[in-house]
Regions:
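Alpha-helical transmembrane segments in inner-membrane proteins
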Residues: 1-328
Length: 328
């Protein structure tokens, strides 16, 4: 297992170097070494590295780790292999918040769009929690159904906003944001979401033992001393903080939170707290790879969700086939 973690870590580092190097303005490995060594480098190269490529690469790693960890956690606590970061309405709420900001504030105000996305995702999860509380049920299926309801409401409002939006500016901005991109990443945006991301990630890692036990039935969890209600609420709060901060900068990224946990389980042949960590690492590699392909496959940069979907579908098909053989 240490060798496997070392191999995945090496793959992430290689992908990170490639991510820094590729683009319209080429940066070589020697340039990267010179910058880190404090040697003399062309001003344009240094500026592109520090203000564009490095923040973008770090943001891609953060997004992959966050979505992978959140997807793994959701699949465990909801006991649903199809659970992903949008299962409880985070993605739908963030999308709605961004759409409202685009229509009401400005299509060019990235701060307003990012803020709208974050608070929209947070509000969606609060609505899910209130809906679950109103039903007086704490079963995992209730959380999933509440998330579906909130997502449906969010999509309906977004469709209405699109119908009345300016087709040349607002509609195009909404569609582009929904497909996800790292092209708008800056150092200031990265630093602004880093504390929220770290709080969410560290919180989940501290609870990983309780999360692992939650793969058992509720009665078994209680017998083992797991306090289901507070632990589940804490996990949802931490994951919302983490995923919401990511989506607020990158827009929606499809499939990453779904395929990373499945790939991690296929690699480790188990489903425990170690899988949560591996899911984050796999997610980082997948998103980094998708971002690299988004920049090199076409003259114009492709939306990130197109690439994560292209990468994710074959993995899910393979998972479906292997599950079918196991149950046959």
């Amino acid at each position: 297992m240490p060798a496997l973690f070392a191999a995945v870590t090496a793959a992430i580092l290689v992908a990170a170097v490639v991510s820094i190097c590729v683009g319209k303005y080429a940066i070589t490995v020697d340039d990267i070494r010179a910058i880190f060594a404090g040697k003399e480098v062309d001003d344009m190269t240094r500026r592109v590295f520090l203000t564009l490529r490095l923040p973008r690469t770090i943001m891609a790693i953060i997004a992959g780790v966050g979505l992978g960890v959140a997807g793994s956690v959701y699949q465990i606590i909801f006991k649903n292999p199809l659970a992903s970061p949008d299962i409880i309405g985070i993605a739908g709420g963030a999308n709605l918040g961004a759409a409202i900001a685009i229509v009401s504030v400005s299509t060019s105000s990235m701060f307003a769009i990012a803020s709208g996305a974050f608070w929209g995702g947070l509000a969606a999860v609060v609505c899910v929690m209130l809906l679950v509380k109103a039903t007086r049920s704490r079963s995992t299926s209730t959380y999933v159904l509440a998330g579906i309801v909130i997502n449906a409401i969010s999509k309906a409002i977004i469709m209405a906003l699109k119908y009345f939006a300016d087709p040349e500016n607002e509609l195009a901005a909404m569609e582009y944001w929904e497909m996800g991109t790292f092209g708008n990443t800056t150092l200031s945006k990265l630093l602004s979401i880093l504390p929220m991301f770290l709080i969410g990630l560290i919180g989940i890692l501290l609870l990983r033992r309780q999360i692992e036990l939650m793969s058992l039935s509720d009665n078994e969890c209680r017998a083992l001393g797991v306090r289901l209600k507070p632990v589940r609420a804490a996990v949802l709060a931490f994951s919302t903080l983490m995923v919401g901060s990511i989506i607020s900068v990158t827009g929606l990224i499809s499939f990453a939170g779904l395929i990373a946990p499945h790939t991690a389980r296929l690699m480790l042949r188990r489903n425990n707290s170690i899988t949560i960590i591996m899911s984050g690492m796999v997610g980082a590699f997948v998103v980094l790879t998708a971002d690299i392909l988004a920049r090199v496959l076409y003259s114009a940069e492709l939306p990130i969700s197109i690439l994560t979907t292209v990468i994710g579908v074959p993995i899910l098909v393979y998972f479906l086939c292997t599950r079918g053989k196991e149950t046959a």
